Amino acid sequence: MASLSKKDLEYRHESNAVSLINMHFVFIPKRRKAVWVGKIAERLQEIIFEVVTENRWKIIALEIMPHHVHLLVNVKPTDSASFVMQRVKSRASSYLRKEFPELLKLPTLWTPSYFVGSVGNVSTETVRKYIEEQRDK
């Protein structure tokens, strides 16, 4: 993962607001199964990038682990954490279950819960490093 750039810490200018809203999400598949491996993990990453681009969000860090996903993303001030998760999880579930029939064995792809924490610009680099280090554990 690339290091945090100065652009990641810049304020977002929208028509009615100036903001710097970085959210750290952790979300897991149903029953915490080791689902995110190989081609499935690669495709999940592509889907997340598509959703982020379509919604004009910015990925700061993304790590897809076999049992969970870390996503550090800059969002618009009009988008809530629940909206971000709904977009990511629903698109991923729909596409992945069509493209990988083995995932149909799971009653649902995601747990309904997730973790989200807001990240200030001072600690964003720390959170990004933490996410990257998860791969080595």
Task: Describe each PLM feature range.
Residues 1-137:
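Basic nucleic-acid-binding interfaces
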